[in-house]
């Protein structure tokens, strides 16, 4: 089935009122072109570059819904500066799936044209014989110095820092130059660190946990949708958390309304 940051983020954004503009830039093999057309039919503005393969993940979940094992059965080609030469945005959200999707030079080019938002997950994934292993971030200091907004979960924060306390990790990442550090903590909520202050965001209880895949991307969509409108850190975090709760309650990407999001926020 289709998935990944581009899929879950795009579907989440399209469910929200068009208060901000959004364009998806993706890179897929010919096998995924029908899915690109479905996104376009759904109203998503998509720029698609050709790749020899489409990245193909296999996810397996156990009894702990916050943990999964992964394999990568195919990899897409990295993005290039030439492909992104004319890209324009106030915020570029880099939803990397693997650690070679974006070179530091490509990130630097985009940073010269807008603010950089990064979901750290892909930068910490290395593929060896189809198996996915956590790895240290290549050129971490260089890329973090270009990053305005960084999102990571409770496992990724340990992979990137070797530490287990989210507040300590957030402060450390801010020292690299990251302006907004967003750490999601699964059923324990999330933590935002910005301008020297912490914001604790609750996790709203879902009626049922049906599908956790894509929750991180859904959170990013809600957070950036709110922040790009000038909404504050705490309110943006609560909006994003409510979207995650609604996403958990069904299979597939986020498909609810802004009214349902507002009713979920306590």
Residue ranges and their predicted role:
Residues 1-13:
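Short catalytic helix/loop segments, enriched in acidic residues and glycine
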Residues 11-21, 226-229:
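Alpha-helix C-terminal capping segments
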Residues 13, 153, 216:
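Short, conserved phosphate/pyrophosphate- and ester-handling motifs at nucleotide-, phospho-/glycolipid
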Residues 15-95, 100, 105-115, 264-266:
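Conserved N-terminal subdomain of the carbohydrate kinase-like
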Residues 55-60, 125-130, 209-213:
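Short, charged, surface-exposed secondary-structure boundary motifs
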Residues 125-198:
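Conserved phosphate/ATP/ADP-binding segment of small-molecule kinases
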Residues 204-265:
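Conserved post-catalytic alpha-helical subdomain immediately downstream of the catalytic base
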